[in-house]
Curated annotation (Swiss-Prot):
Keywords on record: Ribonucleoprotein, Ribosomal protein, RNA-binding, rRNA-binding
Keyword Ribosomal protein: yes
CDD domains, per the entry: Ribosomal_L25_TL5_CTC
NCBIfam families, alphabetized: PRK05943.1
Disulfide bond positions: none
Protein name (record): Large ribosomal subunit protein bL25
Chain's gene name: rplY
Any single GO BP term: translation
GO CC terms, sorted: cytosolic large ribosomal subunit
Amino acid sequence: MKFEAVLRTDLGKGASRRLRNTGYFPAIVYGGEAAPVSISLNHDDVMNQMDKPEFYEAIVLVIDGQEVKVKPQDVQRHAYKPKVEHMDFIRI
């Protein structure tokens, strides 16, 4: 399973809200020896794959052309809408 991710340079609550209004959501990739990286993912692409068991085993994120193998660590969902607010990924 592979997703295209975009590096985020605009951080903070306001930037995250603007990002969610465009159909993307914020996420972070951490772990291993590399520094944590803030990214954004397409909401619809991820939501369509979240009901599959493979989603929670291993994912490949393409971040600016570089493939990173990750596993979802945490998912923050909206209180009553079927939306993802934020995700944490850990490198494997």
